[in-house]
Regions:
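N-terminal hydrophobic/helix-forming segments and targeting peptides
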Residues: 1-463
Length: 463
């Protein structure tokens, strides 16, 4: 059942559309390197497509009807879009669910220190990372600083050409004999992922401050640019991410290399499919969650009540809320958990079982189950639902493939699918194959990005 490379089937018109999708996607990656930035961009694009704030419409007492398009946001890190359909919503929604957080380094609450005339920010890594991949790279600082008076300063350092970047050092090879004998997990330890941010001491300091003259200079710069004091780090969310824009990859420009493609490749293609919809038969929903990389925990993760509460508010705004109707709406819904899959890498072929692996360029990937070992932590989609999704994709000429996440007992991973399935709805993982997943720079195929967009659009129309 080997799948054909999707590139071989495209017409000239399809290739043109593919390139347009890929270009728009790269722009999304450039402006959305944190979950907050992604939510901001999603709102911007949704409003341009006619979406309105659910809270604003509710405050005005406006009732929702078929064709209305609304969104609701939680803590600036999670967002749901709804396009009201023609059928009774209790018959179920067609849902696309992606996550917009990605592995990174988070600045600690008390991070700034100086050592031998070098200033550093202490960090704590977020999500599953190979720590050694994060050293000796140009890095940027993104995030917010919230002061005691409630005012917020948005931080973005390292992306403009004139911006400085920050950096994590590594031991020079000439002195690394002992280091090179360590296991990969220990070569760079978590406490050594400290960000080099300065080396110029401030002049004319009082004697008691001369020992930390470089740190004082950094604080002066932060005060001048963001009006922040050192204490304001306590209420800051600063994320260290790779600096630089998404790039076309390969001499044939067939791929995209960028930070955060897990899972923003599925988030953006889901968004694009959602925004291009005419009034659907079934109500469409696009959900973008936070905290997936650390277990979907917290108030902005999928395990929170955000989604359930959002649907309840939607029903109330439609004038048809009841607890039973809410439960029926969720139970009768169909969902694609829009999350990435491990792309087969011939350089590491021993980690994959080739018949059940995802290949770049062969279309969107269906993962009937994920999890680890004996499918632990998995959502295992029903065969009837897999057949229905297959039929939808085939009817719309979507290139797709099926895969597992590597060989049995080699590793594993999870998504938000099993959490959504707790409502009794049908869910299957469906996303794009990625090379070097969770690395600072990941690689996807433009063809797979395009097929994901087509797949999500087909699902919203016909599921």
């Amino acid at each position: 059942m080997e799948r054909r490379n999707a590139w071989l089937s495209y017409t000239e018109a399809e290739e043109k559309e593919l390139e347009q999708v890929a270009k728009a996607y790269r722009n999304f990656l450039n402006v959305g390197k944190t979950e907050r930035e992604c939510v901001t961009q999603i709102i911007r694009e949704a409003r341009a497509a006619g979406y309105e704030s659910l809270e604003e419409k509710t405050a005005k007492g406006e009732k929702l009807k078929a064709g209305d398009k609304v969104y609701t946001v939680g803590m600036k890190k999670i967002i749901a879009l709804f396009h009201i359909g023609q059928d009774d919503i209790s018959e179920g929604m067609n849902i696309l669910g992606a996550h917009i957080d990605s592995p990174r380094l988070d600045v600690k609450q008390n991070p700034l220190y100086e050592d031998t005339d070098l200033a550093y920010l202490d960090t704590h890594y977020y999500g599953g990372v190979k720590k050694y991949q994060w050293v000796t790279l140009p890095l940027a600082i993104h995030g917010v600083v919230v002061k005691k008076d409630g005012s917020t300063a948005e931080v973005n350092i390292g992306e403009d050409e004139d911006d400085p970047i920050v950096y994590i050092t590594d031991l020079l090879i000439h002195l690394a004999g002992k280091q090179m004998q360590k296991k990969a997990a220990e070569v760079i330890e978590g406490e050594n992922l400290d960000i080099l941010i300065g080396s110029r001491p401030l002049k004319d300091l009082e004697d008691d401050k001369k020992k930390e003259a470089v740190k004082q200079n950094v604080l002066n710069i932060l005060k001048e640019k963001y009006d922040m004091e050192e204490e304001d780090f306590l209420s800051a969310e600063l994320e260290i991410v790779p600096a630089g824009k998404a790039r076309e990859c390969g001499l044939d420009r067939s791929m995209i290399a960028a930070y955060g493609q897990d899972d923003r490749v599925c988030a953006y293609t889901s968004l694009l499919a959602m925004l291009g919809m005419d009034t659907p038969k079934h109500t469409s929903c696009c959900l973008f969650t936070d905290k997936e990389e650390i277990g979907s925990v917290g108030a902005t993760g999928m395990q929170s009540r955000f989604f359930e509460n959002a649907v309840a508010e939607l029903l109330d705004a439609m004038g048809c809320y009841s607890d039973l109707r809410l439960r029926r709406t969720l139970k009768n819904s169909s969902m694609l958990s829009s999350d990435v899959s491990a792309g087969y890498d011939p350089a590491y072929g021993e980690a994959f079982e080739k018949k059940n692996a995802a290949y770049l360029g062969r279309g969107i990937v269906l993962n009937k189950f994920t999890g680890a070992r004996g499918k632990s932590g998995s959502n295992d989609a029903n065969a009837e639902y897999v057949a229905r999704v297959r039929n939808i994709f085939d009817s719309h000429e979507v290139a797709f493939q099926t895969a597992e996440l590597g060989k049995v007992d080699v590793g594993g991973g999870g998504t938000i699918a099993y959490i959504a399935a707790l409502y009794g709805m049908e869910v299957i993982d469906s996303g794009v194959a990625v090379l070097s997943m969770h690395a600072p720079w990941e690689v996807t195929s433009k063809a797979d990005v395009y097929e994901a967009y087509k797949a999500y659009k087909a699902f919203l129309l016909d599921a």
